[in-house]
């Protein structure tokens, strides 16, 4: 999301170097952010945008979010579906339409809170559906599609009675930005998370490790992605709650298995 907001300004490219470093003190506080791996620190305090994504650089994306400012980042979040409940097409057939609880990205945040939100921490809250829509938006060239519960209805002889038509909820970013995000998400797999790779298939992904709350040493392991990156057929979001593994290892194998199963059909 922060990477998309940066690319949309036209001032950043995948190889643009941004501030990183081994630690970053949240503005106006004594709280320091660090990175899980040394590659995320960059070199001489800087890292390319692509490598910041590939190595999950907390220090880089926290500083980037602050540099972009609350308006640009929160606006991108809203375009992607945050801060609004999401209705699911087809669910009204049950008599009670299914509406997903709204994900949340803070608005009018102070710089310290914006820095935390920019790495998925602090007051940021996201459902698996929301994060699946983010992955799908990149796969769809920047268009956020309305999720559907039923693809088609068939009669007893298997003929199609009705077919759900895809509907666009919003355009979050340009197709050019989507292409650059795809390149960066592929680097997540090729540079740092080879366990997510599928033979003969280009996989685009982003891992995440979210803290659950004060006093809880367990984490939520996340991964989102789509495949094939050059001709997307499936977008996935997986979260494994209350684990002690990074997202790549907790949620990654599940995403990989889902993709393999879907692409084998």
Task: Annotate each predicted stretch with a short phrase.
Residues 4-240:
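Beta-lactam-recognizing serine transpeptidase/beta-lactamase-like catalytic domain environment
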Residues 134, 192, 230, 244, ...:
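Intrinsic structural disorder
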Residues 179, 249-256:
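Short, well-ordered alpha-helical segments
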Residues 240-252:
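A short acidic/glycine-rich loop-to-helix N-cap element
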């Amino acid at each position: 999301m922060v990477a998309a907001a940066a690319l949309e300004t036209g001032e950043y490219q995948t190889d643009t170097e941004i501030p990183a470093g081994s630690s970053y003190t949240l503005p106006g506080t004594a709280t320091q952010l660090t990175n899980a791996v040394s590659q995320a620190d960059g070199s001489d305090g800087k890292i390319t945008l692509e490598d910041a994504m590939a190595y999950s650089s907390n220090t880089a994306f926290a500083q980037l979010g602050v540099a972009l400012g609350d308006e640009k980042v929160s606006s991108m979040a809203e375009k992607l579906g945050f801060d609004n409940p999401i209705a699911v097409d087809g669910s009204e057939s049950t008599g009670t339409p299914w509406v997903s609880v709204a994900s949340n990205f803070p608005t009018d945040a102070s710089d310290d809170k914006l820095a935390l939100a920019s790495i998925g921490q602090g007051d940021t809250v996201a459902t698996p559906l929301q994060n699946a829509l983010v992955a799908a938006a990149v796969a769809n060239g920047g268009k956020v599609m309305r999720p559907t519960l039923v693809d088609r209805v068939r009669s007893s002889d298997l003929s199609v009675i009705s077919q759900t038509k895809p509907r666009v909820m919003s355009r979050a970013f340009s197709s050019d930005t989507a292409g650059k995000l795809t390149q960066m998400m592929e680097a997540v797999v090729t540079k740092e998370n080879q366990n997510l790779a599928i033979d003969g298939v280009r996989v685009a992904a982003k891992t995440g490790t979210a803290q659950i709350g004060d006093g809880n040493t367990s984490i939520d392991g996340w991964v989102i992605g789509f495949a094939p990156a050059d001709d997307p057929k499936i977008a996935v979001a997986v979260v494994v709650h209350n684990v002690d593994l990074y997202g790549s290892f907790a949620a990654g194998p599940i995403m990989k298995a889902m993709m393999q199963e879907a692409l084998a059909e």
